[in-house]
Curated annotation (Swiss-Prot):
Biological or metabolic pathway of the protein: Antibiotic biosynthesis; bacillaene biosynthesis
Species the sequence originates in: Bacillus velezensis (strain DSM 23117 / BGSC 10A6 / LMG 26770 / FZB42) (Bacillus amyloliquefaciens subsp. plantarum)
GO terms for biological process, alphabetical: antibiotic biosynthetic process
Residues at the catalytic site: 99
InterPro entries (UniProt xref): Ac_transferase_dom_sf (IPR001227), Acyl_transferase_dom (IPR014043), Acyl_Trfase/lysoPLipase (IPR016035), Malonyl_transacylase_ACP-bd (IPR016036), Polyketide_Synthase (IPR050444)
Record's protein name: Polyketide biosynthesis acyltransferase homolog BaeD
GO molecular function, one term: acyltransferase activity
EC number: 2.3.1.-
Domain of life from the UniProt record: Bacteria
An annotated GO cellular component: cytoplasm
Primary residence: cytoplasm
Localisation per UniProt entry: Cytoplasm
A Pfam family of this chain: Acyl_transf_1
Summary of the function given for this chain in its UniProt record: Probably involved in some intermediate steps for the synthesis of the antibiotic polyketide bacillaene which is involved in secondary metabolism.
Length: 324
């Protein structure tokens, strides 16, 4: 039996200025889809995401944390990459979404049209910026048990995700996260502040719930035609209701369970369609030893995207008997 292909889509924290720029310059399918989606964003809200994303004054090292731009930019880059892969004959047998990446997974699997998915992302960014106070998200490289054992973490943050045995993310108010960072620094526990201005997957976004649910109720949601595995539940979704797209903002991210669910069915080839290769890095820690060859990333801050894309195409389409 052919090895199934699984596309993985990551969320906030994986973005950076100039992401996908090499593909935009050299891959016609990626560029055209990005332009089409940007036209939709301009028509919907009056501003170009691409102009912000690829502005020459915005350096790779600058934090890309303006939600009105970073939210749609992540979706656009992920969906355009999935489209470019499909145009080369590389089509997913499953999709896995994580946090904001659930929208790209939903669009690729047919749950939402690409335009509706982008509209949901744009509206979510607008509502969150208008109704929610700022917050922070912090990745911690340590045993997730630390969250329960350290009173400072448990009392002043919420657990946003456990990504693998030594990596988890918390959300909280900015001043609380700063205190936690000081404490972690004293204890020499590695950590990284994510380029996110709001505390997703925590009570800090609760003010957005009702207006966003009213907006979601207007959307046409379909049954996926490609199996869709969600990190909101850690399993396959078949009967998706509108409120699901609020849950992916508010509930903890269960990517580890989602990946294990997928791999327990059949050992797949996992292609990270996110901007940073974040989920590919997580997958190498989650799946059994010897699985690294089944895990690929294309976009990274170090570029070489065309090379990575060609390597994947060669490995998938070249062997005899592999379906196109």
């Amino acid at each position: 039996m052919n090895q199934p292909i699984v596309f993985m889509f990551s969320g906030q924290g994986s973005q950076y200025y100039q992401m996908g720029k090499e593909l935009f310059a050299h891959n016609a399918a990626f560029r055209q889809k990005m332009l089409d989606l940007d036209d939709f964003a301009v028509s919907r809200f009056g501003y170009s995401v691409l102009k912000e994303m690829y502005h020459t004054g915005n350096r790779l090292s600058d934090p890309f944390d303006r939600l009105l731009f970073s939210h749609p930019a992540i979706f656009m880059a992920e969906y355009a990459l999935a489209y470019a892969l499909e145009q080369r004959g590389i089509r997913p047998d499953y999709v896995i979404g994580a946090s904001l990446g659930e929208y790209a997974a939903a669009a690729v699997s047919g749950v939402l049209s690409a335009e509706d998915a982008l509209d949901c992302v744009l509206e979510q960014a607008r509502i969150v910026t208008e109704t929610c106070r700022n917050g922070s998200m912090l990745a911690i490289l340590g045993d997730p048990a630390l969250y329960q054992d350290d009173p400072l973490l448990g009392e002043h943050s919420e657990l946003a995700s456990v990504n693998y045995h030594s990596h988890f993310v918390i959300s909280g108010e900015r001043e609380h996260i700063k205190k936690i960072m000081d404490d972690l620094r004293e204890k020499q526990i590695p950590h990284q502040l994510l380029p996110v201005s709001y505390g997703f997957h925590s009570a800090l976004v609760d003010q957005a719930e009702q207006p966003y649910k009213r907006f979601l109720a207007q959307k046409s949601i379909r049954t996926p035609f490609i199996p869709y595995i969600s990190s909101a539940t850690g399993e396959a979704e078949t009967d998706i209701q509108a409120d699901f797209f609020w849950d992916i903002v508010r509930k903890p991210i269960r990517f580890r369970e989602a990946l294990q669910f997928a791999d327990s069915r059949q050992k797949g080839l996992y292609i990270d369609a996110g901007p940073s290769g974040t989920l590919a890095a997580f997958a190498k820690q989650i799946l059994p030893a010897g699985s690294a060859e089944r895990i690929r990333a294309i976009m990274t801050p170090f570029h070489k995207e065309q090379t990575h894309l060609q390597q994947i195409e060669d490995s998938i389409l070249s062997p005899p008997g592999r379906r196109l």
